Each structure stands twice: as structure tokens, then as C-alpha cells.
């Protein structure tokens, strides 16, 4: 297993060893704010805790043991059967009128160069970093081997009926068209190639 910083939460909903899916999501805020929110259970009790968080610099933080689960999704069977990985990323971005910067839906400011692609009524996206991609690929490779999860990835751009019954690596956006994570800025082809490459570690 790759180097992982453990910050294990005691706020779990249950345990189940057998896992079918890895679900990718994003934080919608910088990693420090997100981890603080998870730790302090803000917003009336923050129960949507992922198993792992991967920062922009590729650092992996583990929040739950893989056999545990939280109320990340409203459907309990999805929570039981999945390992959830949240990537530090602001998601979709929009230009602030008059001012020369971009923000996401909660008002976090983005100062870099956005990824541009029209999808679900949005045009600008916070890019994922190469360090994130490599850390995610290494982690996913370990997890699919350990939990006998299928080595296949479903892209971001489609909502799939009964996606919870599928095996492999999926996105939060595959469950409901309201969700935009993982976004078009994420390269699923590269992730798949890393995971299937026996030389990649």
C-alpha cells in the first residue's frame, strides 16, 4: 500500500468487508477546509465521510477503514458496497462579473488556468493534478487487488441506471445528473492505463 496519512474517524455508520466499487468524488473546497469540516462534523453533523482524500500535491489521507462506511450516499447499499475516494478539487467554475477571477458554487476563489469543456451547462473546471492522478492510480491499484474489484473505469459523462450494481471504478456523477464529480477535467483513460499497467507502482 502507498504511503498514507491516517486520520481515522470514529463517525461510522457500519462495517462490511466485501466491496464492489470504488466511487470517485471531489471536495468542492481546499483540502484543509474539507478535512476540518469532516473532523468537526459541521453543518449539523457531517456524516458524508469518504474513505480517502487525495490533495492536489498527491498526499493520501485515510479517513475510514475500508471495511467501514459512512452515510456518504443516501442509499445504504451504495455505502456498504463501496470505497469512496474524494479528490481535492473545486469542481465547476464561473467568472465573477466585473472582477477578474473565478469561483465555484460555494464561493471559493480559483486563480489558475481552468480546463474548458461544456458539460451539464458548465464550461470551466478546476483541473486535477498529475500528482493526484498518480496517487489515485496507485491507491486504486492496491484497492482493486485487495478487494477483488473489477479493473474497469466508467467515465464521468453519463448517468447509469442501476450503477450501484456494477463493479469497478465509477464517479458520483454516474449516480445522479445533479452531481458534477468527477468532472470532464479528469482523464479516465490515463487512470485506466495506470491501473492496468503491471509496471506502474
How should these model regions be labeled?
Residues 1-81:
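N-terminal catalytic cores of peptidoglycan-degrading enzymes
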Residues 15-16, 95-201:
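Basic/polar, cationic surfaces and motifs that engage anionic cell-wall
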Residues 21, 82-84, 168-170:
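Structural preference for beta-strand elements that scaffold enzyme active sites
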Residues 32, 62, 92-95, 177-179:
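Short catalytic/ligand-binding loop motif for oxyanion handling, primarily in non-cytosolic enzymes
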Residues 76-79, 92-93, 104-106:
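Flexible, solvent-exposed short loops/turns enriched in glycine
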Residues 85-90:
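Short loop/turn segments at strand-loop or loop-helix junctions that form parts
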